[in-house]
Amino acid sequence: MEALKKIAGVTAAQYVTDGMTIGLGTGSTAYYFVEEIGRRVKQEGLQVVGVTTSSVTSKQAEVLGIPLKSIDDIDSIDLTVDGADEVDKDFNGIKGGGAALLMEKIVATPTKEYIWVVDASKMVEHLGAFKLPVEVVQYGADRLFRVFEKAGYKPSFRMKGDSRLVTDMQNYIIDLDLGCIKDPVAFGHLLDGTVGVVEHGLFNGMVDKVIVASKDGVTVLEVPKAS
């Protein structure tokens, strides 16, 4: 599995050229993309500026010597490469297994070309077998938890050891065990309109390419764009 993730990450790095501003994703597959960019900066003199999606990726990039800029200092990003926890047949996805979904979505939004790197196990018919992360403000989080419980979403607070995990943005994450999300777009809109929800892990209609690594090799899926 790790070998497949590495192949996907290294393949994505081939789309990066001199002078680009690039979004550096978070997670086990994006890790290999960032490593490969670091290698190219060091060995090939690749000139890029990175924008990171988590404190974890910031530390990784700094160690590798990748120059970084804050999201607030840029207007657009040429290319962002990130992982995904599930991708459905319509190229909607669930992200946030690494608890970085808010920063990931903020970086993805001004990106001209958004690429996901995954292994074949992440490609699914319907989203929802992977729990959907919902980032919520700490104030009123328990009340919101009860609302989700009443709606039948089977919520659970994301934990770190014995206490609730706190994200880089100082919020909690409630994971929803939905089983199958029949209409991710409608459910995304529902969560967008829920007071106390900062962001959710449904990335609908955002990705441009999905690089899938399997035992048979690497496939690059181009997402059809609505005309």
Curated annotation (Swiss-Prot):
The lineage of its organism: Bacteria, Bacillati, Bacillota, Bacilli, Lactobacillales. The active site is at 104 (proton acceptor). It catalyses: aldehydo-D-ribose 5-phosphate = D-ribulose 5-phosphate. Keywords: Isomerase. Substrate binds at residues 26-29, 82-85, 95-98, 122. InterPro entries: NagB/RpiA_transferase-like, Ribose-5P_isomerase, Ribose5P_isomerase_typA_subgr, Ribose5P_isomerase_type_A. This is Ribose-5-phosphate isomerase A. It comes from Streptococcus pyogenes serotype M28 (strain MGAS6180). Gene3D superfamilies: 3.30.70.260, 3.40.50.1360.
